[in-house]
């Protein structure tokens, strides 16, 4: 008897709002309890997809293409930096310098590069 009164109470509340009666405790995308009065009915929430306006789609595509162009570099970084700085050209490390032959020329010489003083031995 209490269950029927509860259903009648929810039905009268739903009638005031203009909605269909829904059992207490049921949300969207749920089924009614088995054996209940609404067992055969399913209450699913449906969603409708609407495409954006043509002009909005065009603007979004333009922005996307601009971002793609910004991400792609026209020339690879190795080619761009090749003419600016080269280890072989700027740091003669490892090879013997012509004109400076010492008696230990066959032994490897330790050379260090310092940004404050250039090459050091």
From Swiss-Prot:
Key words of the record: Cell projection, Cytoplasm, Cytoskeleton
One GO CC term, this protein: ciliary base
Record region (Disordered): 1-41, 94-121
Biased composition (Polar residues): 98-108
Inducing stimuli: Expression is activated by FOXJ1 and NOTO.
Compartmental location: Cytoplasm, Cytoskeleton, Cilium basal body
Major localisation: cytoplasm
Tissue: Predominantly expressed in tissues containing motile cilia. Also expressed in non-motile ciliated adult olfactory bulbs.
InterPro entries xrefs: C11orf97-like
Gene ablation phenotype (knockout): Mice exhibited no impaired function of motile cilia or non-motile cilia.
The name this protein goes by in its record: Uncharacterized protein C11orf97 homolog
Source organism per UniProt: Mus musculus (Mouse)
């Amino acid at each position: 008897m209490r269950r029927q009164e509860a259903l009648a109470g929810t039905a009268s509340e739903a009638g005031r709002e203009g909605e269909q009666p829904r059992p207490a405790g049921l949300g969207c995308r749920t089924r009614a309890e088995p054996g209940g009065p609404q067992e055969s009915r399913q209450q699913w929430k449906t969603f409708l997809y609407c495409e954006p306006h043509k002009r909005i789609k065009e603007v979004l595509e333009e922005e996307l293409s601009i971002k793609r162009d910004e991400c792609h570099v026209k020339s690879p970084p190795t080619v761009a930096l090749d003419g600016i700085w080269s280890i072989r050209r700027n740091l003669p490390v490892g090879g013997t310098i012509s004109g400076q032959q010492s008696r230990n020329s066959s032994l490897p010489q330790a050379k260090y590069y310092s940004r404050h003083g250039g090459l050091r031995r």
